[in-house]
Curated annotation (Swiss-Prot):
Its main location: other. The gene is PFRA. InterPro entries: Flagellar_rod, PFR_Component. The lineage of its organism: Eukaryota, Discoba, Euglenozoa, Kinetoplastea, Metakinetoplastina. Residues 335-355 are annotated as: Calmodulin-binding. One of its GO terms (cellular component) is motile cilium. The keyword Cytoplasm applies. This is 69 kDa paraflagellar rod protein. Coiled coil: none annotated. Pfam families: Flagellar_rod. It comes from Trypanosoma brucei brucei.
Length: 600
C-alpha cells in the first residue's frame, strides 16, 4: 500500500464514495474524544520536556540534578503511556470501492450473493406439485407410460428443493426450463386412447350386423315361401343397413384421424428438448462465468492480503528498530547528561543542546507513534473489509456450484420426460397404423356385403325389366290382334300396356338408383383398396365377385329354362355357348388371382 493510504489521506473522489462501515454521529464523537485524549497525552509529554529544558538553564546544583533525575523518570513513564495509550479511530472507512480499485477486483457487492439473501424456490415446489398432479391423472392408460419418469422427476425436484433451501439462489429462471416438456407430457396424457373412442362405434357395427343377419333370415324365408315382394323389400332393407354399416366403418377413419392429429403435435418433442437444453446451457454458462469471476477475485484478494501482511510485518519491524534506536539514544542521552553534570561548568552549552535534541527526538517519536497507530488501524480495517468481501465471494462460488448441480438434475428431468413422450408417440403411431389397416380390412368386408347385395338387386331389376319388356311386346301384339278384329278386350290390353309402361318406368328408376349407389360405394372403396394394395394384402375385388355371381345365376336360370322349354333347345344351346365364352374370357382376365368363397 502507498504512503497516502497508510496515513489515511484520500482524494476528494474517494471521499465521495460510501464507507464500510458507514460513518455515523456516534463514530465521529468517538473519534473526537480519542483525538482529545491523544492530544492530552502529547501535551503532557511535551510540557514535561519543556520543563526539562527549563531545568537545563536554571540553577545548577545537586538539588537541581535530583529534580532533573526525577523528571527523567517521569518522562520515561509518560512516554511509555503515550506509546501504550495512543489509539486512532479513522473517520473515513476503508470502503469496498477502494478495495476493488487497489486489488483489481471485478465483482461488486451488488453482484454477489449475501448471507441475508433468502432462497426463492417456490417455482420448484410448484413443479413438484405439477408432477404429483400428473401422477394422479384421470387417464390411467396414459399415466402408466410415464409413472417411472414422474417418480424420478419428483425425487430429483425434492433433492433440488433441499439444495436450494441451503442456498441464496433465485430458482425462478431455472424452474422455467422443464415447463415446456411438462406441458407436452400433460398434453400427451390428455390424448384419448383410440380403442376407447372406438367402443361406441363397435357397438353400433355389431347392432347393424345383427340387423343384416335378421334381414337375411327374413329374405330367405320369404324366397322359400314364394313371397317375392317381401324378399325384395328385405333386399332394400339389407342394402340400407349395409350402407349405414359402411358409414359406421368409415367413421372409424375419422376417429383414428382425430387421435392421429392430436398425437401429431408431439412429433417435434426433440425441438422442445433442444430449446430447454439451450435455456439450461445459458443459465449454466452465466453461473460458470460468475463462479470464474468470484474465484479470480478470491485469488486477487488472497494475493492482496499476503502483500498487506508482508507490508505490515516490514512496517512493524521498522517501527521496532526505530524504537530500539530511540531507547538507546535516550539512555545514551542520560549517560551524557551524567557526564555533563560532572563537567557542568564547562559543558553547559552541551547540556542545553542535548536537552533540545531530546525534546525534538521525543516530539518526533510521538509523531512517529501517531503515524504507526494510524497505519495499524488502516491495516486492520483493510483486513476487515477483505474478510467481509472474501466471505461474499466464497458464498457466491458455493451458490454457483449449487446452481450448476440443480440445472444438471433439471436437464435429466427434461431428457427423461421428452424420451417418454417420444416413446409414447412412436407407440401410438404404430398402434394407429395397425388399427387403420384392420379397419380397412373390416371396411372391405362391409363393402363386399353391400356391393354384392346391391349387385343382386341390380341383376334382379334388370331381369325384371327384361320380363316387363317381353310382356309389353306380348300385350302390344294382343292389342293389335284385338284392334284387327274389333275385339271388346282391346281396352283391357290397352290399359294393361299403359300399366306395364308405368311399371317399367318405376323399375327403371329403381335400377338407376341402385346403380348410383353401387357407383358411389365403389368410389368410397377407392382409398381402402389403395391402402390394402400398399400393405400387400391380396383380396378379390367385390366387383369381380358380383360379376361371377351374376354369371352363376344366369347359368342356373338357363338350366331351368332348358328343363321347362325343350322346344327352345337351339336358343338355349346358343346362350350356353355365349356363357361358356364369357366364362373363358373372365378366367383369362383374372387368371392367377384367388377368388375365395364369400358367405352372403
Amino acid at each position: 500500500m502507498s504512503g497516502k493510504e497508510v496515513e489515511g489521506v484520500v482524494s476528494p473522489a474517494d471521499q465521495q464514495q460510501p464507507a464500510v462501515p458507514e460513518v455515523t454521529d456516534i463514530t465521529l464523537e468517538a473519534a473526537r474524544k480519542q483525538k482529545i485524549h491523544n492530544l492530552k497525552l502529547k501535551t503532557a509529554c511535551l510540557s514535561n520536556e519543556e520543563y526539562v529544558q527549563d531545568l537545563h538553564v536554571s540553577e545548577w546544583s545537586e538539588t537541581q540534578k535530583q529534580k532533573l533525575q526525577a523528571a527523567h523518570e517521569k518522562a520515561h513513564e509518560l512516554l511509555a503511556s503515550v506509546e501504550g495509550g495512543t489509539k486512532w479511530s479513522l473517520t473515513e472507512a476503508y470502503d469496498i470501492k477502494k478495495l476493488m480499485r487497489v486489488c483489481g477486483l471485478e465483482m461488486s457487492v451488488r453482484e454477489l450473493y449475501k448471507p441475508e439473501d433468502k432462497p426463492q424456490f417456490m417455482e420448484i415446489v410448484a413443479l413438484k406439485k405439477t408432477m404429483n398432479e400428473l401422477k394422479q391423472h384421470h387417464n390411467k392408460t396414459r399415466t402408466v407410460s410415464f409413472t417411472g419418469m414422474i417418480d424420478n422427476a419428483i425425487a430429483k425436484l425434492e433433492k433440488i428443493e433441499d439444495e436450494l433451501r441451503r442456498s441464496q439462489l433465485d430458482a425462478s429462471e431455472m424452474a422455467q426450463v422443464p415447463v415446456a416438456a411438462l406441458k407436452n407430457i400433460e398434453d400427451t396424457m390428455n390424448v384419448a386412447v383410440v380403442q376407447t373412442a372406438l367402443l361406441g362405434n363397435e357397438e353400433q357395427i355389431k347392432a347393424q350386423l345383427a340387423a343384416v343377419e335378421k334381414a337375411n333370415e327374413i329374405r330367405n324365408v320369404a324366397i322359400a315361401d314364394g313371397e317375392m315382394a317381401i324378399a325384395e323389400e328385405q333386399y332394400y332393407i339389407k342394402a340400407q343397413l349395409l350402407e349405414h354399416l359402411v358409414e359406421l366403418v368409415a367413421d372409424k377413419f375419422r376417429i383414428i384421424g382425430q387421435t392421429e392429429d392430436e398425437n401429431k403435435s408431439f412429433s417435434k418433442i426433440h425441438e422442445v428438448q433442444k430449446k430447454s437444453f439451450q435455456e439450461s446451457a445459458s443459465i449454466k454458462d452465466a453461473k460458470r462465468r460468475l463462479k470464474q469471476h468470484c474465484e479470480d477475485d478470491l485469488r486477487n484478494l488472497h494475493d492482496a492480503i499476503q502483500k498487506a501482511d508482508l507490508e505490515d510485518a516490514e512496517a512493524m519491524k521498522r517501527f521496532a528498530t526505530q524504537k530500539e534506536k530511540s531507547e538507546r539514544f535516550i539512555h545514551e542521552n542520560l549517560d551524557k547528561q551524567d557526564e555533563a553534570w560532572r563537567r557542568i561548568q564547562e559543558l553547559e552549552r552541551v547540556l542545553q543542546r542535548l536537552g533540545t535534541e531530546r525534546f525534538e527526538e521525543v516530539k518526533r517519536r510521538i509523531e512517529e507513534n501517531d503515524r504507526e497507530e494510524k497505519r495499524k488501524v488502516e491495516y486492520q480495517q483493510f483486513l476487515d473489509v477483505c474478510g467481509q468481501h472474501k466471505k461474499l465471494l466464497e458464498l457466491s462460488v458455493y451458490n454457483c456450484d449449487l446452481a450448476l448441480r440443480c440445472m444438471g438434475m433439471l436437464e435429466e428431468i427434461v431428457a427423461e420426460g421428452c424420451s417418454a413422450v417420444k416413446s409414447r408417440h412412436d407407440k401410438t403411431n404404430d398402434e394407429l397404423s395397425d388399427l387403420r389397416l384392420q379397419v380397412h380390412q373390416e371396411y372391405l368386408e362391409a363393402f363386399r356385403r353391400l356391393y354384392k347385395t346391391l349387385g343382386q338387386l341390380v341383376y334382379k331389376k334388370e331381369k325384371r325389366l327384361e320380363e316387363i319388356d317381353r310382356n309389353i311386346r306380348t300385350t302390344h301384339i294382343q292389342l293389335e290382334f284385338a284392334i284387327e278384329t274389333f275385339d271388346p278386350n282391346a281396352k283391357l290390353h290397352s290399359d294393361k300396356k299403359k300399366d306395364l309402361y308405368k311399371l317399367r318406368a318405376q323399375v327403371e328408376e329403381e335400377l338407376e338408383m341402385l346403380k348410383d349407389k353401387m357407383a358411389q360405394a365403389l368410389e368410397m372403396f377407392g382409398p381402402t383398396e389403395d391402402a390394402l394394395n400398399q400393405a400387400g394384402i391380396d383380396f378379390v375385388h367385390p366387383a369381380e365377385e358380383v360379376e361371377s355371381g351374376n354369371m352363376d345365376r344366369r347359368s342356373k336360370m338357363v338350366e331351368y329354362r332348358a328343363h321347362l322349354a325343350k322346344q327352345e333347345e337351339v336358343k338355349i344351346a346358343a346362350e350356353r355357348e355365349e356363357l361358356k365364352r364369357s366364362k373363358m374370357l373372365q378366367s383369362q382376365q383374372y387368371r392367377g388371382r384367388t377368388m375365395p368363397q364369400i358367405t352372403q
